[in-house]
Amino acid sequence: MAPTLSADPADRIIVALDGMAPDQALRFAAHVDGLRWVKVGLELFVQAGPEVVAQLREQGLRVFLDLKFHDIPATMAGACRRAAALGAELITVHACAGSEALKAVKVAAEEGAQAAGQPAPTLLAVTVLTSWEEQRLQRELAIAQGIAERVPALAQLSATAGIGGCVCSPLEAAALRAQHPQPFALVTPGIRPRGAAVGDQARVMGPAEAIAAGASQLVIGRPISKAEDPSAAFAACCGDL
């Protein structure tokens, strides 16, 4: 199930703290007017440790812990149990870990959150990373399915296992929303406001278009975090919605 969101557009935008040192991330998050959600990825988590989740929550922020767990079921379950205890409201796992692992992490996350007195997080399954292009996926990983087939197949696998949503490119959001109505969460990176550089994302869309396509929440990084005025950039993205 998706996290509870208000009607405020600010609740729809998750700002990625990628590429920031811990102190920088905390200062940045504290000074973006109206910010509600932040994403903690691998780089920041490895550098700062689990404490960064608590520190961001102390600032009144909601945390998307994007560590993309992918391992054997027992290891994934243990990691999700501990991540849920931190109070992160969104946690990512790789759908291609398989149904056994997906079922295990759902149970473990609920147990970890309950033991720590935290609400159960929404688990998000990663389908196909937005940096992949179809030709590379087939050539380098020998996956015969095209992206248009693989993404919905992995989303269905995840939903059947009880996972609360998935991470997908905004280009796949409309098809997935037709397959999985609310409250199944669709969180979309690869969001680029008009005029923003595409960077290392291969499948991108604007904020308003992504929401119209069925996305629940949008992950936006550099167009806000690297802006001359991050508060103004965040407000502009909210205004687009």
From Swiss-Prot:
**GO MF term set:** orotidine-5'-phosphate decarboxylase activity
Keyword Lyase in annotation: yes
Q: Which catalysed reactions does the entry list for this protein? A: orotidine 5'-phosphate + H(+) = UMP + CO2
UniProt: substrate binding residues: 18, 39, 66-75, 130, 192, 201, 221-222
Question: What keywords sit in the KW lines?
Answer: Decarboxylase, Lyase, Pyrimidine biosynthesis
An example GO BP is: 'de novo' UMP biosynthetic process
GO CC, any one term: cytosol
State whether keyword Hydrolase applies: no
**What's the Enzyme Commission number for this chain?**
4.1.1.23
Active-site positions, per UniProt?
K68 (proton donor)
Q: Which Pfam families match?
A: OMPdecase (PF00215)
Q: In which pathway does it act?
A: Pyrimidine metabolism; UMP biosynthesis via de novo pathway; UMP from orotate: step 2/2
Known InterPro entries for this protein? Aldolase_TIM, OMPdecase, OMPdecase_AS, OMPdecase_bac, OMPdeCOase_dom, RibuloseP-bd_barrel
Domain of life, source organism:
Bacteria
- What role does it play? Catalyzes the decarboxylation of orotidine 5'-monophosphate (OMP) to uridine 5'-monophosphate (UMP).
Question: Belongs to which family?
Answer: Belongs to the OMP decarboxylase family. Type 1 subfamily.
Question: What do we know about how this protein assembles, alone or with others?
Answer: Homodimer.
* Cross-referenced NCBIfam families: PRK00230.1 (NF001273), pyrF (TIGR01740)
Q: What is the protein name given in its UniProt record? A: Orotidine 5'-phosphate decarboxylase
Q: Which organism is it from?
A: Synechococcus sp. (strain CC9605)
